[in-house]
Amino acid sequence: MKEERPIIALDFSSFEETKAFLDLFPAEEKLYVKIGMELYYAQGPDIVRYIKSLGHNVFLDLKLHDIPNTVRAAMAVLKELDIDMATVHAAGGVEMLKAAREGLGQDPTLIAVTQLTSTSEDQMRGDQNIQTSLLESVLHYSKGAAKAQLDGVVCSAQEVEAIKAVTPTGFTCLTPGIRPKGSNIGDQKRVMTPNQARRIESDYIVVGRPITQAKDPVAAYQAIKAEWAG
C-alpha cells in the first residue's frame, strides 16, 4: 500500500535542530519522519518518544546487522518505543531476518536494506566481492527478506519493478535517493524524482536534504508531497 506522505529524513544531531524543524509545520500536519543513526545515537530513545508525542509516524533506520539472538533482543527493545518502521541489513541472512521479525512483532513495518543507494556495481564487486550484477544482488536479498516474512526492502527506485516481480503481492519497496528535478544528488548514485518513483510504484519514498535544507522546508515538503501524490 502506497504511503501518501514522503518520509522526511531528519538529518540532524541535536534535539534543538529537530524541534526547530518540526515546529515549522502546523500542528495538524502529521508527518512521517526517519530517524537515522546520527540523531538516534546523539539523542537516544527520548527523541523517538518526543516525536511520537507530537503525533508523527517514526521510521527508525538503524539497519541492525548482528547475530540473530542480538538482533531479536534489540528489536524487542525498539518495539517498546512504538516505532512505525524499522530496518535490518539483508546481508545478515534469513535467520537473522526471522529473528528481527520475532523481536519486533507483527505490527511495526520491518524492511531490509539490500544494497545502499550510494553503492555502485563496481564498488559492490570490488568491496563486497559479489560478482553478480547489482540488480541480481538486490533481488537475491529481496527474496530472502520475503522468505523471512519481512514487509519489504529498501531499494533504489530503478529496482522496484524487478523486485515486485519476484516477491509476493503486497511486498513493499521503500526508496531513498529521491531528489526533485534539478536538485543536488549529493552522495547518492541511483536517484529518481518523486514523480518517477510514483510511476514505477514505489510504496514509500524518503527525502532529506531537499526538504530539511530548503529555504522554505514546509513549501518544499508540500511540493514534493504533491508530486508524489500525482
UniProtKB/Swiss-Prot annotation:
Binding site for substrate: 11, 34, 61-70, 117, 179, 188, 208-209
Active site per the UniProt annotation: K63
Domain of life assignment: Bacteria
Single Gene Ontology BP annotation: 'de novo' pyrimidine nucleobase biosynthetic process
Listed Pfam families: OMPdecase
Molecular function (Gene Ontology), one example: orotidine-5'-phosphate decarboxylase activity
Record has Lyase as a keyword: yes
E.C. numbers: 4.1.1.23
Catalytic class of the enzyme: lyase
SMART domains assigned: OMPdecase
InterPro entries listed in its UniProt record: Aldolase_TIM, OMPdecase, OMPdecase_AS, OMPdecase_bac, OMPdeCOase_dom, RibuloseP-bd_barrel
Reaction(s) catalysed (UniProt annotation): orotidine 5'-phosphate + H(+) = UMP + CO2
Pathway membership, UniProt: Pyrimidine metabolism; UMP biosynthesis via de novo pathway; UMP from orotate: step 2/2
Subunit structure, interactors included: Homodimer.
Stored HAMAP family: OMPdecase_type1_B
Function description: Catalyzes the decarboxylation of orotidine 5'-monophosphate (OMP) to uridine 5'-monophosphate (UMP).
Family note: Belongs to the OMP decarboxylase family. Type 1 subfamily.
Record's protein name: Orotidine 5'-phosphate decarboxylase
Source organism of this protein record: Streptococcus pyogenes serotype M18 (strain MGAS8232)
Gene that encodes the chain: pyrF
